[in-house]
């Protein structure tokens, strides 16, 4: 990987910084989340939200979406050039929920985007604070990952719905920068590339002319991002082939789908960050916590600490289970939608169940839902232990495959085996090893066949007590090796529709 020497930690990507030492990183990440908190407090003042209403996760999401929309340059420009009926390109808004006479009411608010931008900049020392915006995008993306299934999107691009564990970050907007690229799964990158290649096949001019040159640069950049996520030489070599193709077409699509399948066992490195709703940072700032001075990290104990001391509420529909709603938000907060349920349950200290068993729908409430019957309850976002977030796929050692699983992309750096049904995965690799990538394909299949489900990943890594902030005493959990835990089994979640 060419950028080896300039590898930045994800906190640096998150804050757009050059290389910094640990203290500087903690300070700049602290500045970023502190800015989000200050913005949130100001918005609550503007909207005259009570303390309880300000802690409502649905209100937090509306406020976050407003600021993201206010800074969405490309869409703003598009809206101004293509005026559509009933949409004011200069305004943004959404539903705000208020408590009136013992009932929840929905109020639709509208604000000038200019005004929202002013409040955001003011909260961020006059800067645009793009890092904070990206942070909010990643929180929304993590929430989508935990809430919706992407079966339809997978099938549309010719991939297998069982590859859902590779789809982290699939709803992130294009403008989410380096921090966004770091959290995208293998499947997400493959899907973006396939969509691009398909456009090129259907539209003769896609790769031509001035625009085509820009398209080509974007294509190669995406290929390089994907290449950087693979950890074996053969997978990377195949990515070079895809990137260098003169005229990307069906052969490249085949190669990409092959690579995506291979990532079920030879997992890629995908970053995980605990991005919390804006109201959580707001609560901390309001209570006098100075994020910049104290420093903050998205991958250590800090988010766990913050959630231990925050009370957040959620609207609950009549037949939803509040404990299940809490699990959904907990998973989103820790970017754990693709983590092994055995690991998540151990860290959380309560059983985390597969999505098919959850009696809850998404967090956001549609405008046509009846507010009369809405109730609210406290989200239980606390944990029993904390663990370091990982950006590796948990392969037992870099060049050799370790057992993957049809649906796990580890979030926490905690020792476990990664059980998987090799037969199921290998069945997808019938025959086709001819063509220009044949030797690489053969090599990849060989590595996958030598993977053993009983291999231990993250050897010796454990969880920590919440009092152990320096991570001195790892507690290595022992898991039932046979029982494998994917969140997506027996899945009946709704599809993500933009």
Curated annotation (Swiss-Prot):
Where is this gene product found? Virion; Host nucleus
Q: Where is this motif: Unconventional nuclear localization signal?
A: 1-18
- Name the GO cellular-component terms: helical viral capsid; host cell; host cell nucleus; ribonucleoprotein complex; viral nucleocapsid
Q: Which intervals of this chain are the motif Bipartite nuclear localization signal?
A: 198-216
Identify the keywords attached in UniProt to this record, alphabetized.
Capsid protein, Helical capsid protein, Host nucleus, Host-virus interaction, Ribonucleoprotein, RNA-binding, Viral nucleoprotein, Viral penetration into host nucleus, Virion, Virus entry into host cell
Post-translational modification remark? Late in virus-infected cells, may be cleaved from a 56-kDa protein to a 53-kDa protein by a cellular caspase. This cleavage might be a marker for the onset of apoptosis in infected cells or have a specific function in virus host interaction.
Where is it mostly found? virion
Q: Which stretches does the entry tag as region Disordered?
A: 1-21
Q: Which GO terms describe its biological process?
A: symbiont entry into host cell; viral penetration into host nucleus
Which GO molecular function terms does the record list?
RNA binding; structural molecule activity
What does the record give as the function of this protein? Answer: Encapsidates the negative strand viral RNA, protecting it from nucleases. The encapsidated genomic RNA is termed the ribonucleoprotein (RNP) and serves as template for transcription and replication. The RNP needs to be localized in the host nucleus to start an infectious cycle, but is too large to diffuse through the nuclear pore complex. NP comprises at least 2 nuclear localization signals that are responsible for the active RNP import into the nucleus through cellular importin alpha/beta pathway.
What quaternary structure, including any partners, is listed in this protein's UniProt entry?
A: Homomultimerizes to form the nucleocapsid. May bind host exportin-1/XPO1. Binds to viral genomic RNA. Protein-RNA contacts are mediated by a combination of electrostatic interactions between positively charged residues and the phosphate backbone and planar interactions between aromatic side chains and bases.
Family according to the record: Belongs to the influenza viruses nucleoprotein family.
Q: Would you tell me the protein name for this molecule?
A: Nucleoprotein
- To which species is this protein native? Influenza A virus (strain A/Turkey/Ireland/1378/1983 H5N8)
Please name the taxonomic classification of the source.
Viruses, Riboviria, Orthornavirae, Negarnaviricota, Polyploviricotina
């Amino acid at each position: 990987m060419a950028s080896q020497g300039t590898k930045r930690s994800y906190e640096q990507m998150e804050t757009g910084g050059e290389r910094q030492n640990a203290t500087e990183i903690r300070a700049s990440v602290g500045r970023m989340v502190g800015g989000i908190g200050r913005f949130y407090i100001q918005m609550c003042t503007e909207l005259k939200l009570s303390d309880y209403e300000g802690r409502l996760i649905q209100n937090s999401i509306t406020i976050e979406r407003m600021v993201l929309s206010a800074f969405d340059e490309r869409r703003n420009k598009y809206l101004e050039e293509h005026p559509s009926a009933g949409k004011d390109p200069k305004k943004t808004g959404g539903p705000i929920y208020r408590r009136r006479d013992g009932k929840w009411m929905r109020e639709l608010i509208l604000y000038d985007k200019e005004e929202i931008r002013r409040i955001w900049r003011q909260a961020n020392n006059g800067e645009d604070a793009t890092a904070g915006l990206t942070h909010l995008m990643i929180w929304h993306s993590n929430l989508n990952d935990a809430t919706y299934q992407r079966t339809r999107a997978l099938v549309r691009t010719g991939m297998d719905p069982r590859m859902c564990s590779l789809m982290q970050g699939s709803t992130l907007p294009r403008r989410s920068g380096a921090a966004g690229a770091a959290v995208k799964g293998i499947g997400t990158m493959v899907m973006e590339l396939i969509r691009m290649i398909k456009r090129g096949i259907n539209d003769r001019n896609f790769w031509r002319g001035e625009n085509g040159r820009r398209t080509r640069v974007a294509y190669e950049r995406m290929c390089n991002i994907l290449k950087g996520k693979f950890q074996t030489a053969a997978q990377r070599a195949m990515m070079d082939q895809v990137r260098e193709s003169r005229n990307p077409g069906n052969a490249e699509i085949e190669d990409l789908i092959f690579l995506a399948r291979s990532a079920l066992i030879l997992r890629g490195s995908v970053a995980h960050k605990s991005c919390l709703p804006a109201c959580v940072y707001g609560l901390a700032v309001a209570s006098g916590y100075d994020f910049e001075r104290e420093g903050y990290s998205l991958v250590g104990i800090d988010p766990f600490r913050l959630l231990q001391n925050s009370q957040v509420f959620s609207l609950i529909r009549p037949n939803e289970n509040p404990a299940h709603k809490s699990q959904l938000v907990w998973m989103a907060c820790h970017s754990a939608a693709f983590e092994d349920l055995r690991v998540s349950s151990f860290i959380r200290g309560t059983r985390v169940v597969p999505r098919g068993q959850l009696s809850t729908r998404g967090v956001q409430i549609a405008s046509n839902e009846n507010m009369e019957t809405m109730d609210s309850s406290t989200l239980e976002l606390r944990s029993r232990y904390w663990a370091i977030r990982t950006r590796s796929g948990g392969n037992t050692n870099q060049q050799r495959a370790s057992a993957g699983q049809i649906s796990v992309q580890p979030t926490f750096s905690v020792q476990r085996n990664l059980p998987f049904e090799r037969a199921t995965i290998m069945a997808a690799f019938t025959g086709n090893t001819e063509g220009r990538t044949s030797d690489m394909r053969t090599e990849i299949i060989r590595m996958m066949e030598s993977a053993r489900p009983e291999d231990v990943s993250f050897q010796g890594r454990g969880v920590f007590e919440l009092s152990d902030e320096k991570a001195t005493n790892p507690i290595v959990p022992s898991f039932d090796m046979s029982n494998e835990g994917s969140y997506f089994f027996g899945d009946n979640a709704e599809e993500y529709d933009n």
